[in-house]
Amino acid sequence: MLDNALLGLTHEQQQEAVEKIQQLMAEGMSSGEAIAFVAQELRQKQQKLNNTHS
């Protein structure tokens, strides 16, 4: 599930991801769904960054 786009997160980015996952779970989403959702968001952000630097 992890890929290069997710492995290079700063500590701050990791903390934000954890908080987002916890928020989604508090709203009723399962842990697996929340993790997948946040991972997809991170991949999309990374892809946008890569596209703007190309």
From Swiss-Prot:
InterPro entries according to UniProt: UPF0181
Pfam families: UPF0181 (PF03701)
UniProt similarity note: Belongs to the UPF0181 family.
Protein name, per record: UPF0181 protein PM0480
Organism in which the protein naturally occurs: Pasteurella multocida (strain Pm70)
